[in-house]
Amino acid sequence: MQPALNAFTEQPADTAEATSRAGLEQAFALFNQMSSQLSESYSLLEERVTELKGQLALVSAQRMEELAEKERLANRLQSLLDLLPGGVIVIDAHGVVREANPAALGLLGEPLVGMLWREVIARCFAPREDDGHEISLRDGRRLSIATRSLNGEPGQLILLNDLTDTRRLQEQLARHERLSALGRMVASLAHQIRTPLSAALLYAGHLSEQALPTDQQQRFAGRLKERLHELEHQVRDMLVFARGELPLTDRVAPKALFDSLRAAAEVHVQGLQVRWQCEARGGELLCNRDTLVGTVLNLVENAIQACGPELRLKVHLYARADSLRLSVSDNGPGMDPATLARLGEPFFTTKTTGTGLGLAVVKAVARAHQGQLQLRSRPGRGTCATLILPLIPAAPLSAIQE
């Protein structure tokens, strides 16, 4: 009985051992499987890390190249600003100068960076009556000033351009041109002045006669006055053309200028068909009022002489942007392109009498007002002469301070 009992007892132990071994084998197989998966995942992770490192290195290299290119561009722009002949100033939202190139420092002096712009204006600028669209410094130089907003941030960019040398060269050139024509002018004027002067002397001689009736005295006195006015007109034209400069001391509203012109022209256009039209109301004109009115009267007289009694004349004053335009148009015979091209040259005239200085004087007066004269004409269609003059802002410096 004992051997049989032992056999029965050993059988369950073998079964338990086999079960335990199978569990271990299964666990070991599962461990191997998990290890293999982890190894594969680690390999994939290493590959991904390597790939990301490569991408990061590429992006970093590109970024560094972009930064280097931006730095080179910034250096080029800085060099360009340093070499610009014009001044460049950057002011922030509080009106403080943050940057200024060497040209700006040369124009306005130091200190500049860190100063309030309004303090710089008070220290450096000395506006004059004849500045127009330019502004004078205390040392006499003339600047043009332009402002631009800073895109994307508060503040302003101020551009300064020194026009002193340009204006001086323009004045010298105009002076040389006038001097080169002076000889011809003297000869022409001597001939033109002789006739009214001789007539004036003749009428003065008649007036000295004691027994002359009163009505004849008045007639001779009137003719003497006409000849003297003619002489005065020719001398005035000569002086304006020779000097080429005018003191611009009058600030006149366009409507006031129009009224002055209409009053002065009343005697000249009496009995003629004239249309007066004024469409400019705002702004001011920096000018020499008397000379400017006399210049426009020259244009009116030219139209009257060209058209005769059948004259239909229009005097039109209007504004375009920042300029004032005063046009005198007629229904006369007009001119061909060749004649129109020469019109305004000193001593060129299509009349049998006259010095040929009329339109040359008009051009000189327009230039003295920083404006220009435009002429349009067609044969059989009349002529239109237009003076274009700059309108002056009421307070050019206050806008910059703001």
UniProtKB/Swiss-Prot annotation:
GO terms for biological process: phosphorelay signal transduction system. Residues 188-393 form the Histidine kinase domain. Member of the two-component regulatory system FleS/FleR that regulates the expression of multiple genes involved in flagellar synthesis, adhesion, swarming, motility and antibiotic resistance. May function as a membrane-associated protein kinase that phosphorylates FleR in response to environmental signals leading to activation of specific gene promoters. Disruption phenotype: Mutant shows severe swimming defect. It is an enzyme of class 2 (transferase). GO terms for molecular function: ATP binding; phosphorelay sensor kinase activity. This is Sensor protein kinase FleS. It catalyses: ATP + protein L-histidine = ADP + protein N-phospho-L-histidine. PANTHER family: SENSOR HISTIDINE KINASE, SENSOR PROTEIN KINASE FLES. It comes from the Bacteria. Gene3D superfamilies: 1.10.287.130, Histidine kinase-like ATPase, C-terminal domain (3.30.565.10), PAS domain (3.30.450.20). InterPro entries: HATPase_C_sf (IPR036890), His_kinase_dom (IPR005467), HisK_dim/P_dom (IPR003661), HisK_dim/P_sf (IPR036097), PAS (IPR000014), PAS-like_dom_sf (IPR035965), Sig_transdc_His_kin-like_C (IPR004358). It comes from Pseudomonas aeruginosa (strain ATCC 15692 / DSM 22644 / CIP 104116 / JCM 14847 / LMG 12228 / 1C / PRS 101 / PAO1). The modification Phosphohistidine is found at H191. The keyword ATP-binding applies. It holds the Pfam family HisKA. The keyword Nucleotide-binding applies. Keywords: ATP-binding, Kinase, Nucleotide-binding, Phosphoprotein, Transferase, Two-component regulatory system. The gene is fleS.
